[in-house]
Design a protein with these regions (language model features):
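Aromatic/acidic, Gly/Pro-rich catalytic loop(s) in extracytoplasmic/lumenal soluble domains
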Residues: 24-92
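Residue-level signal for well-ordered alpha-helical segments
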Residues: 2-3, 45, 114
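Alpha-helix boundary/capping residues
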Residues: 19, 53-54, 171
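Generic recognition of flexible, low-complexity loop/linker segments
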Residues: 10-16, 55-56, 114-116, 124-126
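Extracytoplasmic/lumenal acceptor-recognition loop(s) of multi-pass membrane glycoenzymes
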Residues: 1-23, 27-34, 74, 88-96, ...
Length: 172
């Protein structure tokens, strides 16, 4: 966010994509515009930086809040139809030039914050959660351990396609 608001990129959406962020809300008033509230307008530089973003599109909303949709969004649990390099994408500059919009949502049956299920294909599964070695992906009776991705998130290398479960084991 800091890089985007500084004016150093016009692709802030790509920087937010690995976090699974689809919408950005900029609130400038404590209540809707038709009622009394406290104004807290954003600065001109911030307004210009947000307005220059190529992948953050404004939605029609109340004047008290600006909602931007991230056109570079990807699901927080995703696989990619075309090859995308997920290893070594640790620097913001690398993310800005990497298109993650081909991400296909997987593991969409959310049982809890610690368990999701669904179909996955063979290949890398990206999970937009802070890397934690206690996460597991179970597919075809095989348990897969996480690898770091984006310098903070996780990826799992699924050996096969099929029903899968992503779950977290509490440490002892």
């Amino acid at each position: 966010v800091e890089i985007g608001l500084s004016g150093n990129t016009t692709r802030m959406g790509r920087l937010l994509a690995p976090f699974g962020i689809r919408y950005v809300a900029v609130v400038e008033r404590s209540t809707p515009s038709f009622s009394d509230g406290f104004d807290r307008p954003i600065g001109l530089r911030t307004r210009q930086a947000l307005g220059s973003q190529l992948d953050l599109r404004p939605l029609a909303t109340d004047p008290s809040v600006t909602v931007l949709v991230n056109e570079s969004w990807m699901s927080s649990r995703a696989q990619f139809g075309s090859p995308v390099r997920l290893v070594g994408l640790d620097e913001p500059g690398e993310l800005v030039v990497t298109d993650l919009t081909s991400g296909i949502p997987v593991l969409t049956d959310r049982r809890s914050s610690r368990e999701q299920r669904g179909f996955v294909g063979a290949g890398e599964v990206l999970v937009a959660e802070a890397y934690d070695p206690n996460w597991r992906l179970l597919i075809g009776g095989e348990t897969i351990f996480p690898e770091p991705s984006f310098g903070w998130a996780m990826r799992f290398d699924s050996p096969t396609s099929g029903r899968a479960a992503l779950f977290h084991i509490r440490p002892d």
